[in-house]
């Protein structure tokens, strides 16, 4: 009987405790650009990230090996290494090309992290065909957008 009373008081105490809502932030992405080289020898992705009152940094990637399609980029640090990002195109399904996705991860001083992502349809990354030279992919969507972080 003592155990039931103890268990009941613990449950009531836990139920009376306020539940903290997880704080969310918004990462403002600006100047986003992504393309492959018309010469068929490289790719570049570049953008700025600002999470108000937390961090502001520049993120970029370049290579000299990509062909006409943008590469998958695994977790890559920005200039401020508390922010890392990754970029990929999802696998295609029958009748459609896969969506593109960027993931932003910010390591907080507490040791926790917040993350969010943004998706685009494949039509925002058209493959431009060029006669006599290599094809290239050039991002054609909005250069500024927001990512909800949690």
Positions of PLM-derived features:
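Fungal secretory targeting signals
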Residues: 1-23
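A generic structural micro-environment signature
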Residues: 7, 16, 35-38, 55, ...
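Acidic, low-complexity intrinsically disordered segments
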Residues: 72-150
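Short, surface-exposed binding/anchoring microloops in extracellular/periplasmic proteins
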Residues: 19-74
